[in-house]
Amino acid sequence: MREAVIAEVSTQLSEVVGVIERHLEPTLLAVHLYGSAVDGGLKPHSDIDLLVTVTVRLDETTRRALINDLLETSASPGESEILRAVEVTIVVHDDIIPWRYPAKRELQFGEWQRNDILAGIFEPATIDIDLAILLTKAREHSVALVGPAAEELFDPVPEQDLFEALNETLTLWNSPPDWAGDERNVVLTLSRIWYSAVTGKIAPKDVAADWAMERLPAQYQPVILEARQAYLGQEDRLASRADQLEEFVHYVKGEITKVVGK
């Protein structure tokens, strides 16, 4: 199954890795494919997720050239018949090994940055609480395209740090403007956070949605059902459930907080 999914995107993957190698050798230590491609299968709107580890920080010329070339290998969901959205996260070895929280991210590329990149705006290195989640994902399910396996290269993330990162993520969503236009992703991400808070593991979005569905009061189940169906390729109608959606967000945040504190 996993090999078939990777084969499905092998041409695009080769192009992306080629760009990374061209710009980052000889500082490149590892490239790991993680996310839907290796855990749960690619869905219609799934990104190709790559974690890249290097030995030194990127200079500004390399950063800009790499990002501009990555832009040519990626497309927003639904905009290309041959390209998927690509998300690339780059970390410097000594920033994350040994592990400490919160960790520093050297670079992140994704389709949400396209307009900024075209306008000449490039995100600098920054502290990123999500690295606790990302590295946990990579250690649990990933394929090393370059370098050693993730579980050999990276330290395990302590559960306390994972929970802290999950809890911090909850602060992003407080009122409808916070999820407007991104309803499906927010619903599914909340389901994953809830799943992770209870189990200490990370699941594909549709698996976490099924898990959450079994634990939700009946009045919130249509919200997660709509999100799951949209994730699998059906029409996204979540915006029409504004009141239910807001109640769902606050309910699930409350359930998560019971587990992770604050």
Curated annotation (Swiss-Prot):
The keyword Membrane does not apply. CDD domains: NT_KNTase_like (cd05403). InterPro entries: AadA/Aad9, AadA_C, NT_sf, Polymerase_NTP_transf_dom. Gene3D superfamilies: Beta Polymerase, domain 2. Keywords: Antibiotic resistance, ATP-binding, Nucleotide-binding, Nucleotidyltransferase, Plasmid, Transferase. Its EC number is 2.7.7.47. GO terms for molecular function: adenylyltransferase activity; aminoglycoside 3''-adenylyltransferase activity; ATP binding. Pfam families: AadA_C, NTP_transf_2. It comes from the Bacteria. Mediates bacterial resistance to the antibiotics streptomycin and spectinomycin. This is Aminoglycoside (3'') (9) adenylyltransferase.
